[in-house]
């Protein structure tokens, strides 16, 4: 072997020239400690807040949340048992993002946008978007003026929800909160079957900390009723790590924003944000952030406000798209003055209160119409609904007041008795079975019959039968009236024909 002196001296010179340079360890760090889904890592000097990192030895990813002077606190998206002290951690150089686009419709994904429904990879992804972005400012927005039809009479008549609104659904466990949300998704089948893209309403259902069986049941219901085709389900079940439960609403929101920013309409349901707050509290306490009220961190209000502010109605210059948010909050023993409920009530544009007592009295959906409110109000209703439902709120309020007095006195005058009878029938009329949302023209006819006195002579127990037979009669004999209400969105031109149809039906009903 021939060794040339010149080569050796060149190698030695280069070694000497490079001697003493610092090795750059900014993109690779090592684990100092790990436990409870949190890793403390040394050496990731240039990592950004919210950046993805990878643990190559364990094959899991994480997100940098705490950037401290001598270490970085990382939350782990997965099982931390395979991670050991001293393991290598690599920066991925990207903030957490998810795939967005119409290719996700009909799919069930995890909070990182990976499919978990066994139907193979997601096709035709439009782009990838960061999960946590700034909400639109004041200038790109427009006031809410188009309705989101939930298909539930109690909501569409009294607490109307508009496209771009944030309407909270709040109540104890087992009061039908998810049922209201699922019915809203099912009711969009008719508009999504049409060809008018400006009327379609795509749906995103985000399940946070739910049982897997519950999520599977909801997906099955949507699939059986043909609603999964226009719905994305984002699932972070109770068995998933807290960081994924915390991330799920943001991932779903990024998917919804793609529709909003491309001139389409979407509604997103967060079921429920109480569990997201609990997951965030767990992460924050493990990261040693200082606790505040009810041990939640100080920025839990900001967590929910920055999420819900992303629901918006955009103006003409920005494509007229909208994202409507229906967050769900679970209360304990009807206590709406707890920390998270009061926070979310103050962020949203109204709330739908569901009550256990009403639920067990058989009033379902169990909406307490007295304290539920929509701050957008009748600007989110079509003209026909305003005309039909105008008197109903006042009549129900008077009914509740008189019903409270009627408990004490037996000798009631005729006007009071009439008011009580009308209120009972209207309350009965607002009942509705699950998975049977009504089209807006059917609701207009039902509510018009109730508020204009056509139910006053019907026994309360017969109101449900009267309504179903009335709608069958209208479809059979007066489909033209229903079509006109649906297309013209106004009662004026058909009101006289509707009155005579109702009078004829009321006379024949027995």
From Swiss-Prot:
Top class in the EC scheme: translocase
Gene Ontology MF terms: ADP binding; ATP binding; proton-transporting ATP synthase activity, rotational mechanism
Feature type site, description Required for activity: 372
Catalytic activity: ATP + H2O + 4 H(+)(in) = ADP + phosphate + 5 H(+)(out)
E.C. number(s) listed in UniProt: 7.1.2.2
Residue sites binding ATP per the record: 171-178
Taxonomic superkingdom: Bacteria
InterPro entries listed in its UniProt record: ATP_synth_asu-like_sf (IPR023366), ATP_synth_asu_C (IPR000793), ATP_synth_asu_C_sf (IPR038376), ATP_synth_F1_a_nt-bd_dom (IPR033732), ATP_synth_F1_asu (IPR005294), ATPase_a/bsu_AS (IPR020003), ATPase_F1/V1/A1_a/bsu_N (IPR004100), ATPase_F1/V1/A1_a/bsu_N_sf (IPR036121)
UniProt cross-references to CDD domains, sorted A to Z: ATP-synt_F1_alpha_C, ATP-synt_F1_alpha_N, F1-ATPase_alpha_CD
Pfam families to which the protein is assigned, alphabetical: ATP-synt_ab, ATP-synt_ab_C, ATP-synt_ab_N
Keywords carried by this UniProt record: ATP synthesis, ATP-binding, Cell inner membrane, Cell membrane, CF(1), Hydrogen ion transport, Ion transport, Membrane, Nucleotide-binding, Translocase, Transport
Topology in the lipid bilayer: Peripheral membrane protein
Family the UniProt entry places it in: Belongs to the ATPase alpha/beta chains family.
Subunit structure: F-type ATPases have 2 components, CF(1) - the catalytic core - and CF(0) - the membrane proton channel. CF(1) has five subunits: alpha(3), beta(3), gamma(1), delta(1), epsilon(1). CF(0) has three main subunits: a(1), b(2) and c(9-12). The alpha and beta chains form an alternating ring which encloses part of the gamma chain. CF(1) is attached to CF(0) by a central stalk formed by the gamma and epsilon chains, while a peripheral stalk is formed by the delta and b chains.
Name of the featured protein: ATP synthase subunit alpha
Record gene name: atpA
């Amino acid at each position: 072997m021939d060794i040339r002196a010149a080569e050796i001296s060149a190698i030695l010179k280069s070694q000497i020239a490079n001697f003493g340079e610092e090795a750059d360890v900014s993109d690779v760090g090592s684990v100092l400690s790990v436990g409870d889904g949190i890793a403390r890592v040394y050496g990731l000097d240039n990592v950004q807040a919210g950046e993805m990192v990878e643990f190559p030895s364990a094959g899991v990813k994480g997100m940098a949340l705490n950037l401290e002077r001598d270490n970085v606190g990382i939350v782990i998206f997965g099982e931390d048992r395979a991670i050991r002290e001293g393991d290598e951690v690599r920066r991925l150089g990207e903030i957490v993002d998810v795939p967005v686009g119409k290719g996700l419709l009909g799919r069930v994904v995890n909070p990182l946008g990976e499919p978990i429904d066994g139907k193979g990879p997601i096709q035709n992804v439009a782009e990838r978007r960061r999960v946590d972005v700034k909400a639109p400012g004041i200038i790109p927005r427009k006031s809410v003026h188009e309705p989101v039809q939930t298909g539930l009479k109690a909501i569409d008549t009294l607490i109307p929800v508009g496209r771009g609104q944030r309407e909270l659904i709040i109540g104890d466990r087992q009061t039908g909160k998810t049922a209201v949300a699922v019915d809203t998704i099912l009711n969009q089948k008719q508009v999504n079957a049409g060809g008018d893209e400006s009327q379609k309403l795509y749906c995103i259902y985000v399940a946070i900390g739910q049982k897997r069986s519950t999520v599977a049941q909801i997906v099955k219901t949507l699939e059986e009723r043909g609603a999964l085709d226009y719905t994305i389900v984002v699932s972070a079940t109770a068995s998933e790590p807290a960081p994924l439960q915390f991330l799920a609403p943001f991932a779903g929101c990024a998917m919804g924003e793609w529709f909003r920013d491309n001139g389409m309409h979407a509604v997103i349901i967060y079921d429920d944000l109480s569990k997201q707050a609990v997951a965030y509290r767990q992460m924050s306490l493990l990261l040693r952030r200082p606790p505040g009220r009810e041990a939640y961190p100080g920025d839990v209000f900001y967590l929910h406000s920055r999420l819900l502010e992303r629901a918006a109605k955009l103006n003409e210059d920005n494509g007229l798209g909208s994202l409507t948010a229906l967050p769900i909050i679970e209360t304990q023993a009807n206590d709406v003055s707890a920390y998270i409920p009061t926070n979310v009530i103050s962020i949203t544009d109204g709330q739908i209160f569901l009550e256990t007592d009403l639920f067990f009295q058989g009033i379902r959906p169990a909406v307490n119409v007295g304290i539920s409110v929509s701050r957008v109000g009748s600007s989110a209703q079509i003209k026909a609904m305003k005309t039909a439902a105008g008197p109903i709120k006042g009549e129900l309020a008077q009914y509740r007041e008189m019903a409270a007095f009627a408990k004490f006195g037996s000798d009631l005058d005729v006007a009071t008795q009439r008011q009580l009878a009308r209120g009972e029938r209207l309350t009965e009329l607002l009942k509705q079975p699950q998975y049977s949302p009504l089209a807006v023209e059917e609701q207009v006819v039902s509510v018009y019959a109730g508020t204009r006195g056509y139910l006053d002579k019907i026994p309360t127990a017969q109101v449900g039968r009267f309504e179903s037979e009335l709608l069958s009669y209208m479809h059979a004999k007066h489909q033209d009236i229903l079509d006109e209400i649906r297309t013209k969105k106004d009662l004026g031109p058909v009101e006289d024909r509707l009155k005579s149809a109702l009078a004829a039906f009321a006379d024949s009903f027995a």
